[in-house]
Amino acid sequence: MAKEIKFSEDARAAMLRGVDQLANTVKTTLGPKGRNVVLDKSYGSPEITNDGVTIAKSIDLEDHYENMGAKLVAEVASKTNDIAGDGTTTATVLAQSIIREGMKNVTAGANPVGIRTGIEKATKAAVDELHKISHKVNGKKEIAQVASVSSSNTEVGSLIADAMEKVGHDGVITIEESKGIDTELSVVEGMQFDRGYLSQYMVTDNDKMEADLDDPYILITDKKISNIQDILPLLQEIVQQGKALLIIADDVAGEALPTLVLNKIRGTFNVVAVKAPGFGDRRKAQLEDIATLTGGTVISSDLGLDLKDTKLEQLGRAGKVTVTKDNTTIVDGAGSKDAIAERVNIIKKQIDDTTSDFDREKLQERLAKLAGGVAVVKVGAATETELKERKYRIEDALNATRAAVEEGYVAGGGTALVDVLPAVAALKEEGDVQTGINIVLRALEEPVRQIAENAGKEGSVIVEQLKKEKQGVGYNAATDEWEDMAKSGIIDPTKVTRSALQNAASVAALMLTTEAVVADKPDPNANNNAAAGANPAAGMGGMM
């Protein structure tokens, strides 16, 4: 297809229009008084959300050049979500400010490379200062506060704190949809290991790119499966029962993998294959753990067992299995409590006996997975639309809480970004590099400005007042009061704030140094073809 190219000012102006359209949509959701956005769906009812990354990903603009600008900012939100799990709206607001102010200066004749250098230096200074003013999370109360701010709901905050208390900071917490209207927390025996599906065609949820198996059989083996004939009799029995199957093996390759994928796509049966976790002797031990949890048997040559002779009774069972590209979570395994308790005692004895710190750490990981269980948050709501919106909020809250446990927390509501202004302002450079620093100084004020404007206040007035307050004191948009943010429970994970700034600065700096944009040339016949398709009688020359 022929290409169309725009250069310098034309290219940047078109991309900026796209940036503004996306960012102006997303930033209306920022803060406790942020609004919702309604997303049209090709099927089902419209979706109502205030989740920044969900909104950003759903926006496609008709103009190719504008769409490129929008997609680059959507990438900022997506990357921040991947790293920290929250802060996507803040990242979008920061990116828009840096891009907009940067393009003004580039248009006025500034050197974009110098501006980029200034942006990078200012961002590093801001991130270093964020780490200095960060506080460690101590106890259930602070965990609940982080989750409450992220979800704008104190009940959700308490729920996440309870879940973390029950399974530990590193424990597995999953979020499911409930059939009722109440949101509940339960802890079930379960395990998670760091192996994902071998083919993305095995997923059952294309939005989340994960596979959910209800009440599946689980084949556990340390062998490599390359010939489908080895497990064909077993597969036929499972298909007859209408059950799903999880295969945990050394590898699934050769003709076996495409055959399984083909049967999954055709709807013959639901199957997911993953590689066994660990390596060497540690892999064998982990497979035994999984077998104990699910009430199955490891099909291994060491035990004189062959795949061809495997019976249904030797397979494990579980209430639910969720597989993503990176992890497999087994919930409600069918193993007996006595067998699990015995296995736990064996691992505890091994921990006491070992002299290796590395081995002790790995054994403790196995113990946590086997004995800790999985916390399941069942999200309830009156309608499907409300259910989806509430689920997004709880997922954000969980991600924010984990980020806070990892790197600590700072004052929320955009206060921390204003608190680091003096450290950034202390940088003194020449010319366009200083211009880049000034651009970041302005951008750091933008989240507070937007939160205030969403609450019906004059953003500039709030920002100027905030600069006069002592560190940690900020504007609480929910109560319209000036408060010590940490004492009021308005705190953000340091990792979320840091990631939002770093990702925004990175993409903004790249956009400012863009000199040409290449896009597909619009097809002049496309509209004519569409019109003809919409009117079957078109071109039939009066044959009536």
UniProtKB/Swiss-Prot annotation:
Source taxon at top rank: Bacteria
Main subcellular location of this protein, as a coarse class: cytoplasm
Coiled-coil annotated residue ranges, if any: none
Pfam family, one: Cpn60_TCP1
Swiss-Prot/TrEMBL catalytic activity: ATP + H2O + a folded polypeptide = ADP + phosphate + an unfolded polypeptide
Entry keyword Isomerase: yes
SUPFAM superfamilies per record: GroEL apical domain-like, GroEL equatorial domain-like
Gene Ontology terms, MF aspect: ATP binding; ATP-dependent protein folding chaperone; isomerase activity; unfolded protein binding
Residues annotated as binding ATP: T29, L30, G31, P32, D86, G87, T88, T89, T90, G413, N476, A477, A478, D492
Keywords for this protein: ATP-binding, Chaperone, Cytoplasm, Isomerase, Nucleotide-binding
Subcellular location: Cytoplasm
Residue ranges, compositional bias (Low complexity): 524-538
Biological function: Together with its co-chaperonin GroES, plays an essential role in assisting protein folding. The GroEL-GroES system forms a nano-cage that allows encapsulation of the non-native substrate proteins and provides a physical environment optimized to promote and accelerate protein folding.
Assembly mode: Forms a cylinder of 14 subunits composed of two heptameric rings stacked back-to-back. Interacts with the co-chaperonin GroES.
Protein name: Chaperonin GroEL
Organism listed in the record: Lacticaseibacillus paracasei (strain ATCC 334 / BCRC 17002 / CCUG 31169 / CIP 107868 / KCTC 3260 / NRRL B-441) (Lactobacillus paracasei)
